[in-house]
Amino acid sequence: MSFNVDIDEADVAVLNQNLIKSKELFTSISRSLNKISTKSSTASIKIKPILKDVNKLNDNRNQLDSGLNLLSEVSNYASETSKYEAVLNNSIELIGLKKFIDTLTRSKVLLTEMKSNIKRFKGILINFENLIDKSELNLENYFQKSLKSNVMGTNKMNEIILIFQYFYSSSMSGQKTIDKIFMRSQSIKMAEIMRPHEEPTKPIKRSSNIPYEKGSNGINRYNNEMIKAIKGEIGLLNEVGAKINLNASAKDMFVLDIVRKVVNESYAEVIGNFNKVFGQSKILHNDLLILETIENLNHFEKFLNVSNIDVRSFPAFNENYHQLINISSEIFRELIEYSENRVKSVERLTDLNATEAVVELISRIRKLSEYNISLLKLISGMKLGSWLNLKPAVRFISVYTSVIPNLSDDIDETAPEHLLSCFISDYIDSIIINIEIGLKADVSLKKSMQGYYLIKNTILIETIVNRSQQLFNSLGNLGIERLNRLKKRFLKLFLDDWNYASYIIIRDMTTITTTNAVSGHSGSGMSSKEKEQIKDLFKNFNESFEDALRNYEKYNITDVNLRAYLSGEIKKLIMNAYFKLYDKYGSGEFTKNKAKYIKYNKHQFEQILNEKL
């Protein structure tokens, strides 16, 4: 309130009175304001708890709404998991693999979502996670069961691929788990496949006079089944790998891990059993079985290389394999020793028993030569001629060897093929030269007869060689040349009678010519001395020739090839000499009785040779 006071006109009393009234009014207003303030303060104190309760009620209402929403969400998850449990708690066979895996995949997605949204409900999460773990374990067991099947049909293969794809898409841990199960299962399966084939590989004890029948041991079947099983694993991995993007190195690792146990244990034991038997007797007692075994091992080794499987990954297998090679390489020394002893065991060599020995010994090397790969494997790394280092020393070397000096750098004397050719040639030398030694010990045998026995058996050896493609190839050009050198050596001995007849012509014709030149006879006719010399020449030749024919007929040669060869060599030797004699003195001017001395003209001479030879 405001008042306008005119100080000049107002009375002091009035002014004082107005001041007093104003003071009273202000005092009254102050008291009213104090009352209002007191009441406002009291109201404020009383209102605060009410607001707090209201806010609390609002919070509780919000929490209740949130809880109701959470319970609703949990209820939904529980309903969802219940559906999955209904599937996963049943057997895969009943539900079907694809539905089982699809449900399991969705369950894992749901579990991840639940862990994010209802993580406080640990009981629900744990139970559902346990169900998933149990289901994956069931899937692993089903996988193992599927792998045990002996028949891998299309349906079974598709199931295996589905399981692989599931675990390969889950986690690295899942991938490692399924890989481990697969490799272990397949390794066990391979061992079970090979187990029935192990027993038949064990060598059967035989008497020394009973030969091994080719293929009677189970090593061929064992090796073939092993290769077949590994090929099956490779094929399976190729098919599976294409679906799960398995690279080549990973596939090779799979195969190696699968086959390592069966090769390093089963196959190594098979070889070990061979080593025990072979090490207890002469190699020749089991020669064919040894070569058959090595041939299979070599085949297996090559198969591993082609399949990118390092054979060095199997230490026990390799150790036994190398031991087998070391034991068996003695076969070459034993064969040389056997060939000498076989011929030496014949007390008195005849046409019959010499041929029997040759047939027996050459037939043996022919059979062995069929295992060319094995022989090359055994002889590889050996020193040239080391198979002749025997005690007592081999005796044929001191008499003759058909060895041809190597004058060419083109021949690699360390090559297994060259070593094998040299060995076979030495073996043939040992047979035939030992027969020569035995025949020469019989002083009653003429040289020509000795030569006949030797050339006959050399031709027999040549015939057997020519009929055996593998033996012929193993000998090679060098070996055939060495065989020809033996033929030439014995042909010369055989032609001793014919050489003498031919020698008479050459000797006497030379003597007659020389005598005439010395005597200075230059007349148109022959001197008496020359005529007598010519008569003696024809007489001596006829006797020698007829003697050679008689001796030849005693041989009773039935072999067409042998007869053709010998008759050809005889004709080359004797016909040329006789034709020269006939051309010189065939006119018969040296005698009045031509028929007495000149029994054959050229045509007749050739005709009688054709008839008699």
Swiss-Prot record:
Record-level GO BP terms: exocytosis; protein transport
Gene Ontology CC, one term: cellular bud neck
Family: Belongs to the EXO70 family.
Cellular compartment(s): Bud; Bud neck
InterPro entries linked to this entry: Cullin_repeat-like_dom_sf (IPR016159), Exo70 (IPR004140), Exo70_C (IPR046364)
Membrane-crossing residue ranges in chain numbering: none
Domain of life: Eukaryota
Protein known as: Exocyst complex protein EXO70
GO molecular function, one term: phosphatidylinositol-4,5-bisphosphate binding
Function: Involved in the secretory pathway as part of the exocyst complex which tethers secretory vesicles to the sites of exocytosis. Also plays a role in the assembly of the exocyst.
Lineage of producing organism: Eukaryota, Fungi, Dikarya, Ascomycota, Saccharomycotina
Predominant cellular place of this UniProt entry's protein: other
Keywords from the named record: Exocytosis, Protein transport, Transport
Pfam families listed in its UniProt record: Exo70_C (PF03081), Exo70_N (PF20669)
PANTHER family in the cross-refs: EXOCYST COMPLEX COMPONENT 7, EXOCYST COMPLEX PROTEIN EXO70
